[in-house]
């Protein structure tokens, strides 16, 4: 399909919030540097509008301003209701591009999702399988989503945590449309923040790319949050993901 039709097929939706607006400048600087020929509209969702308090996009093609008081999922649904393309590439605003995006390859992957009528094509094989009603069948990792399906998930959950943990078990088994995952990581980004703190990889990326940032605004995590994160990684490394996630869901453990 011709590139000029790409903007009718898919929209990039960046989930943000006013508390994380300081991340948008490095996000956009790296986006324009590493994907200058992105064929899709770049839309951000957050509580407030542009710098003028209204519709200014602040470097995005469009900002959807929800107003205060909505949960993460409610903000996601609000934005999706204002997008018309059948597919959405959903990203978090701390997913910072670390190398050039291959536009032709992205269009191939979108075509693969369209040809299969896929509900989701996840571009990070972690976990390596895509199985409905299993751990991380739904993930905030970079991927192409059927917009209507994504909207349905957003309306049934509240937080990003619920979206992943509970949404993974909300599939209708009678729906033949697949969920898919690529064999290798196909979208080149660093997950730069964790629980509001910079990850070392994110700091290193900014320094390598010469992107300025005032780290007095937010820095690296203190000892205890870092220890908790490392312990969680160890649990997932030792025990089956399915077991861990089901226990978390039953007892509301690890909620973000």
Predicted regions and their residues:
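N-terminal anchoring/stem segment of glycosyltransferases
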Residues: 1-68, 80-82, 86-87
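PAPS-dependent sulfotransferase catalytic core
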Residues: 179-229
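Short, flexible, basic/aromatic active-site loop/helix in glycosyltransferases
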Residues: 127-135, 149
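Conserved donor-nucleotide/metal-binding helix-loop-beta segment in metal-dependent transferases, i.e.
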Residues: 99-125
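Membrane-proximal basic amphipathic "stem/tether" segments
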Residues: 8, 116, 210-256
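Short beta-strand-to-loop acidic/aromatic patch adjacent to the donor-nucleotide binding site
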Residues: 86-96
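Catalytic core and acceptor-binding pocket of nucleotide-sugar-dependent glycosyltransferases
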Residues: 138-201
């Amino acid at each position: 399909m011709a590139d000029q039709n790409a903007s009718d097929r898919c929209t990039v939706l960046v989930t943000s919030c006013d508390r994380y607006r300081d991340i948008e400048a490095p996000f956009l600087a790296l986006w324009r540097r590493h994907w200058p020929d992105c064929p899709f509209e770049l839309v951000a969702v957050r509580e407030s509008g542009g710098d003028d308090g209204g519709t200014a996009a602040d470097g995005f093609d469009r900002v959807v301003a929800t107003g205060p008081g909505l949960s993460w999922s409610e903000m996601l649904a609000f934005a999706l209701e204002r997008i018309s393309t059948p597919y959405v590439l959903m990203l978090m605003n701390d997913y910072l591009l670390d190398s050039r995006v291959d536009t032709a390859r992205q269009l191939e992957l979108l075509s693969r999702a369209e040809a299969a009528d896929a509900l989701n094509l996840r571009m990070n094989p972690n976990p390596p399988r895509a199985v409905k009603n299993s751990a991380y069948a739904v993930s905030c990792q970079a991927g192409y989503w059927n917009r209507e399906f994504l909207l349905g998930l957003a309306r049934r959950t509240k937080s990003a945590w619920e979206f992943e943990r509970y949404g993974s078990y909300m599939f209708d088994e009678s729906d033949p449309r697949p969920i898919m995952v690529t064999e290798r990581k196909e979208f080149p980004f660093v997950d730069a923040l964790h629980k509001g703190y910079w990850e070392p990889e994110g700091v290193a990326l900014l320094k390598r790319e010469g992107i300025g940032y005032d780290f007095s605004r937010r820095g690296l995590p203190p000892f205890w949050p870092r220890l908790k994160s490392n312990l969680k990684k160890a649990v997932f490394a030792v025990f089956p993901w399915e077991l861990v996630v089901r226990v978390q869901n039953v007892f509301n453990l690890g909620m973000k």
